[in-house]
């Protein structure tokens, strides 16, 4: 239910900001006007180079570098062509992942119970068991610290780790990024909330994987020049392999009966 609600919220947010994209869409039309093309191209290149220089002044080991990197776009970017802004987003995202990976490594050094309490604090999880202990102030503050600086915690079958908060980026930049980037972020957030594999096995219904295959197939077809087309293609390929070939602990065929396992039979019927 949490996954469904989050997806709906993100989708509504996406629709709500379409009207605000009018300026950017007009700016895209300007790029096709030869009399303005070179001027706009030079202007946008300056934006990109200035941002790259700015990122070089920020520390990848400092989590507060994330809001600094994204708040750079608070002013002076209202009329920039959103295809060019997507390149700026790519620079931000690359930097974001470096900071996230550092924080992930730091978090992995905590004892498991410490990780669990921080996770419980972030998502306000409680328990009625007698021996349950509520997160302390330090754990609560750490959870807030991560969230306020654009990072999230994921818990996959008890494995807790620092992960991306795509809602953070989307909310901050929704009026500037292109529609494909919007769709890309929404889909990544949805999939990060429900990972499809663990321990060499498929842990979601085959229908879920089928829907992702359809989404990425259409997305790639409609956005051939997308800045993250390679990443989108990789996801598309991964889901197809899982769907049609299964995984070590989720085989397509039952060796003993020499027939399709029921979950794959249902999945194939669904996609047909």
Language model feature labels by segment:
Residues 208-211, 227-231:
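Structural signature of alpha-solenoid helical repeat junctions
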Residues 18-20:
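Bacterial signal peptide processing site
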Residues 13-16:
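C-terminal motif of bacterial Sec signal peptides marking the signal peptidase cleavage site
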Residues 113, 117-125, 132-135, 141-142, ...:
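Short coil/linker segments at helix-helix boundaries
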Residues 82-83, 171-179, 219-230, 271-272:
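Short solvent-exposed coil/turn linkers within tandem alpha-helical repeat scaffolds
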Residues 1-8:
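Sec-dependent signal peptide recognition
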């Amino acid at each position: 239910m949490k996954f469904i609600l989050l997806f709906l919220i993100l989708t509504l947010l996406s629709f709500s900001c379409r009207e605000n994209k009018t300026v950017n869409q007009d700016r895209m039309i300007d790029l096709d006007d030869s009399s303005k093309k070179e001027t706009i191209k030079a202007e946008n290149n300056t934006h990109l180079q200035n941002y790259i220089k700015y990122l070089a002044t920020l520390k990848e080991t400092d989590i507060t570098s994330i809001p600094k990197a994204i708040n750079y776009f608070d002013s002076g970017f209202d009329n920039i062509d959103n295809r060019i802004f997507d390149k700026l987003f790519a620079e931000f995202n690359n930097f974001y992942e470096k900071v996230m990976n550092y924080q992930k490594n730091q978090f992995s050094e905590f004892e498991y119970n410490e990780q669990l309490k921080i996770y419980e604090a972030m998502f306000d999880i409680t328990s009625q068991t007698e021996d349950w202990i509520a997160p302390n102030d330090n754990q609560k503050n750490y959870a807030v610290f991560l969230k306020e600086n654009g990072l999230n915690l994921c818990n996959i079958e008890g494995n807790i780790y620092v992960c991306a908060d795509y809602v953070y980026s989307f909310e901050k930049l929704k009026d500037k990024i292109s529609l494909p980037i919007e769709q890309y972020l929404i889909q990544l957030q949805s999939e990060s909330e429900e990972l499809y594999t663990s321990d060499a096995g498929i842990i979601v219904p085959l229908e879920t994987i089928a829907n992702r295959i359809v989404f990425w197939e259409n997305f790639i077809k409609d956005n051939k020049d997308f800045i993250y087309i390679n990443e989108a293609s990789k996801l598309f390929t991964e889901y197809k392999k899982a769907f049609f070939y299964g995984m070590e602990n989720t085989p397509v065929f039952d060796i003993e009966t020499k027939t399709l396992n029921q979950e794959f039979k249902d999945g194939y019927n669904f996609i047909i």
